[in-house]
C-alpha cells in the first residue's frame, strides 16, 4: 500500500454518511469520535446522517450493547436523520433483519461470476502455502477459482459446504482518500476473500458494502483500522454497480488511530476508552465532544475550546489529520472544566444533582424534588463551586460540607497534613473572635474582617497558617469553596460547632 498526498477529492453535493457500529460492548471513545465526525460532516454540508446497526455476529452481539449505543448517542446529542428508531426509505436498519437482502445479492454475484464457491478449509490453505514455500499467514491462494462442476460435486459428496469468495482482479486498486490522499494497493496484494460462510451466514465484507450501496451512502468515514479492507470493498462496489445494486462508488476517508497510554492504540478494554466511565466521573457532553473533536481535527491553530455549533460551521473531513491522535485524559478534563464554567448556573445545578444524589449528599436526583433547604444552599453555593470543579463528580466534595448540619467533620488525610503546631491556638483565637459576631452580622465581609484582624493583624499568623485550620474545620478538606462565603452559608451555629469540634480533637 502506498499513499500520495494532495489528491483528496471534492465532496458530493448531497452528502450521505453513516454510523454503523456493532453492538459488542460498552460504547468507547473511538466509536463516538467516528459518530461525531460523520454527524458533523452531515450537519456542515446539510446532508443526511444514517444510523444503522451491524449485528450479524450472534456470538458477540448483545441487546444490552445495542441499547447502550442508543443511550450514548442520545446523551451526547448526536441525532440522526434516517435509521434506528426514526425509520427511513431504506430499512430495516439492523443487519440481523436484512438476511434475505444479502442472500439475494450473494446469489447475483455468484451467477455473474464475480463470486465463486470455495471448498478449501483453513488447514488445506495453510498446507498448500507451506508446500509452496510461502509463509503460513500468506492467505488464500486462489485454489478454488476455477473448479469444475465435477470437482464441486466431489466436494459436496464428502459433505463439504462451500463458502463464497469474491474474485479479485489481477490489477492495482487505487482510490483518493478524503484524509490521506491517493492510496494504491498492488495487484495480488489482496487475496480473494470470503463474503458468505459455508453455513450461509453473510460476513461484514458483504453486508457493509451492500448496506452502503442500498442506503445510497456516498461518503464513508471510518477508522484507520478498516483501511486494509477498502480495496476489497472498492472491487465489490464495482460489481454491485454492474449488477445495478449500487449507483456510484462512495468516497472513503480513514480517520487516524486514537492512541492511549504508552503510545499504544487505545483498546476497548482500556478504562479511558469507556464512554460511560467518563460520564460517571462527571464529564458533560459539551466538554467530551469538544475534546473528541480534537482527536485528529482542530477548529483553529490557537484554539481548543468550542461549541458543537461552531464545530458544525467549520468542520470539513478533508481537514482531519492522518497522524495518530493521543487520548490525553488530563487535557480532556481541562476542556471539560471550561465547558462547565460556561453553563448557566441553574443548568450547572440541574446537571449536578444526579451526581450529588448518587454520592449521598442530597435527598433526590432532580432539582425539583430537592428540599427547600437543599435548593437554597446549592443556589448560594453554585457561584462558589462552578468555577472550581473540572468534573461534575467533584461537586459533592465541594458542597457536602455546606449541605451538612454536622457540628464536627472528620478531616481527610490531606487536610490533616495542613494542620501545623499552631492550629490549636489559631482555632482558640478564631472561636473567641467569632463568638462576638452577632447573628445579623454573620456575613462574608464581616467574617473576613473579624478573622483577619484576630488571626493576622493581632495574632501575627501568616494567612495560610491563620485560615488553614478554619478551612479544615469548615469542610474537612484542604481544598474547598471560598472560606468566608462557606461560613455564611452554613450559619453561625454550625460554623462555631465545627470550629469547637476540631479544636477538641487536636
Swiss-Prot record:
Enzyme Commission number(s) from the entry: 6.1.1.17
Top-rank taxon: Bacteria
Keywords: Aminoacyl-tRNA synthetase, ATP-binding, Cytoplasm, Ligase, Nucleotide-binding, Protein biosynthesis
A UniProt-annotated Pfam family: tRNA-synt_1c
Xref: InterPro entries: aa-tRNA-synth_I_cd-bd, aa-tRNA-synth_I_codon-bd_sub2, aa_tRNA-synth_I_cd-bd_sf, Glu-tRNA-ligase_bac/mito, Glu-tRNA-synth_I_codon-bd_sub1, Glu/Gln-tRNA-synth, Glu/Gln-tRNA-synth_Ib_cat-dom, Glu_tRNA_lig_a-bdl
GO-annotated molecular function: ATP binding; glutamate-tRNA ligase activity; tRNA binding; zinc ion binding
Gene3D superfamilies tied to this protein: 1.10.10.350, Glutamate-tRNA synthetase, class I, anticodon-binding domain 1, Glutamyl-trna Synthetase, Domain 2, Glutamyl-tRNA Synthetase, Domain 3, HUPs
Binding site for ATP: 268
Catalytic activity, reaction form: tRNA(Glu) + L-glutamate + ATP = L-glutamyl-tRNA(Glu) + AMP + diphosphate
GO BP term (any one): glutamyl-tRNA aminoacylation
Family: Belongs to the class-I aminoacyl-tRNA synthetase family. Glutamate--tRNA ligase type 1 subfamily.
Name listed for the protein in its UniProt record: Glutamate--tRNA ligase
Organism whose genome encodes this protein: Bifidobacterium adolescentis (strain ATCC 15703 / DSM 20083 / NCTC 11814 / E194a)
Amino acid at each position: 500500500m502506498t499513499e500520495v498526498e494532495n489528491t483528496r477529492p471534492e465532496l458530493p453535493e448531497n452528502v450521505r454518511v453513516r454510523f454503523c457500529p456493532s453492538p459488542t460492548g460498552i460504547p468507547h471513545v473511538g466509536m463516538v469520535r467516528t459518530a461525531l465526525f460523520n454527524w458533523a460532516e452531515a450537519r456542515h454540508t446539510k446532508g443526511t446522517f444514517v444510523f444503522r446497526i451491524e449485528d450479524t455476529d450472534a456470538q458477540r452481539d448483545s441487546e444490552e450493547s445495542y441499547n447502550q449505543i442508543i443511550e450514548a448517542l442520545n446523551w451526547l446529542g448526536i441525532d440522526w436523520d434516517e435509521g434506528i428508531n426514526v425509520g427511513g426509505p431504506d430499512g430495516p436498519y439492523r443487519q440481523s433483519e436484512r438476511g434475505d437482502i444479502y442472500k439475494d445479492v450473494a446469489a447475483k454475484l455468484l451467477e455473474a461470476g464475480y463470486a465463486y464457491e470455495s471448498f478449501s478449509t483453513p488447514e488445506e490453505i495453510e498446507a498448500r502455502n507451506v508446500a509452496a514455500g510461502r509463509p503460513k499467514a500468506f492467505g488464500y491462494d486462489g485454489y478454488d477459482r476455477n473448479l469444475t462442476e465435477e470437482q464441486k460435486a466431489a466436494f459436496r459428496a464428502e459433505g463439504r459446504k462451500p463458502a463464497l469468495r469474491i474474485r479479485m482482479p489481477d490489477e492495482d486498486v487505487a482510490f483518493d482518500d478524503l484524509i490521506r490522499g491517493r492510496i494504491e494497493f498492488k495487484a495480488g496484494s489482496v487475496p480473494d476473500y470470503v463474503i458468505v460462510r459455508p453455513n450461509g451466514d453473510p460476513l461484514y465484507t458483504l453486508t457493509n458494502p451492500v448496506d452502503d450501496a442500498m442506503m445510497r451512502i456516498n461518503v464513508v468515514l471510518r477508522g484507520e483500522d478498516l483501511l486494509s479492507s477498502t480495496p476489497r470493498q472498492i472491487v465489490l462496489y464495482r460489481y454491485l454497480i454492474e449488477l445495478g445494486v449500487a449507483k456510484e462508488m462512495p468516497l472513503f476517508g480513514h480517520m487516524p488511530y486514537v492512541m492511549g497510554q504508552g503510545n499504544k492504540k487505545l483498546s476497548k478494554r482500556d478504562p479511558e476508552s469507556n464512554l460511560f466511565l467518563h460520564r460517571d466521573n462527571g464529564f458533560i457532553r459539551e466538554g467530551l465532544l469538544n475534546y473528541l473533536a480534537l482527536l485528529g481535527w482542530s477548529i483553529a491553530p490557537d484554539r481548543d475550546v468550542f461549541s458543537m455549533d461552531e464545530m458544525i460551521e467549520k468542520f470539513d473531513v478533508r481537514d482531519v489529520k492522518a497522524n495518530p491522535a493521543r487520548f490525553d485524559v488530563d487535557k480532556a478534563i481541562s476542556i471539560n472544566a471550561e465547558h462547565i464554567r460556561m453553563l448557566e448556573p441553574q443548568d450547572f445545578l440541574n446537571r449536578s444533582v444526579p451526581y450529588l444524589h448518587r454520592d449521598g449528599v442530597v435527598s433526590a436526583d432532580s432539582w425539583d424534588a430537592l428540599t427547600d433547604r437543599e435548593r437554597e444552599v446549592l443556589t448560594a453555593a453554585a457561584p462558589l463551586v462552578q468555577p472550581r470543579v473540572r468534573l461534575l463528580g467533584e461537586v459533592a466534595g465541594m458542597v457536602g460540607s455546606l449541605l451538612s448540619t454536622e457540628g464536627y467533620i472528620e478531616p481527610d488525610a490531606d487536610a490533616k497534613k495542613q494542620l501545623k503546631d499552631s492550629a490549636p491556638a489559631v482555632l482558640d483565637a478564631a472561636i473567641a473572635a467569632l463568638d462576638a459576631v452577632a447573628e445579623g452580622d454573620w456575613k462574608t465581609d464581616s467574617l473576613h474582617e473579624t478573622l483577619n484582624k484576630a488571626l493576622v493583624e493581632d495574632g501575627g499568623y501568616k494567612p495560610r497558617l491563620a485560615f488553614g485550620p478554619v478551612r479544615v474545620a469548615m469542610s474537612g478538606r484542604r481544598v474547598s469553596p471560598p472560606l468566608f462565603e462557606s461560613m455564611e452559608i452554613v450559619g453561625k451555629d454550625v460554623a462555631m460547632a465545627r470550629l469547637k469540634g476540631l479544636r477538641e480533637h487536636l
